Amino acid sequence: MTEKEEIVRKGYDKIAEKYQADRHLFNNIKELEELESLLPKNAKVLDVGCGAGVPVTKFLVDSGFDVIGVDFSENMLRFARKNVPKAKFIKKDMTKLDFRDNSFDGLTAFYSIIHVPREKHSSLFQSFHRILKPEGVILICVGPDEWEATEEYYGSRMFWSHYSPEKSLQLVKDAGFQILFEKHLVKGREKHYWILARNKK
């Protein structure tokens, strides 16, 4: 794990309680419903950078899906296991997803890719392609503009790393995905760039 990634892990361990208390402000139900409509019944879904499990992991479980959440913050996972007891949670670095090929029907990554050093984004999207089944679907968000910085967030140091939306979209396409929608959305006073895409193998 790089120094920048360690800043993120330690930061979320420190702010876990405050952060999870504000998750209701980030309502992406419409986008999640679009994802839900594209997945088979009883789909197996991976929530990458699941945090405290709300609202994303909970929505997926409530939709009847078999859900695994991964995060490298132990404190976030502690809340996730309490908030969504029907999901399975694993402590794991999202840049080292060692699941078998074609393991999942769907994958979500909300507010997590933005903390991964951008030079790793290409290989990250390629790993999504590998572990998703053919025709599997991803719903992810990335930064709204090109930017990299370490700043204070909820009273703790935090690291962000973004490419431009155009660059991010191209990396997703290059990884083997067909774009279903891409758009800027403001949720909880924050703007992000959202991508829904289908895996092509």
Language-model region placement:
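A short SAM/SAH-binding and catalytic strip from SAM-dependent methyltransferases
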Residues: 106-119
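Class I SAM-dependent methyltransferase SAM/SAH-binding core
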Residues: 46, 52-96
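A short acidic, Gly/Pro-enriched loop at the edge of an enzyme's catalytic core
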Residues: 95-107
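Conserved class I S-adenosyl-L-methionine
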Residues: 1-40, 146
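A short glycine-rich, Lys/Arg-flanked "PGG" loop and its adjoining helix->strand segment in the class I
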Residues: 122-134
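Acceptor-substrate binding/catalytic loop of class I
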Residues: 150-166
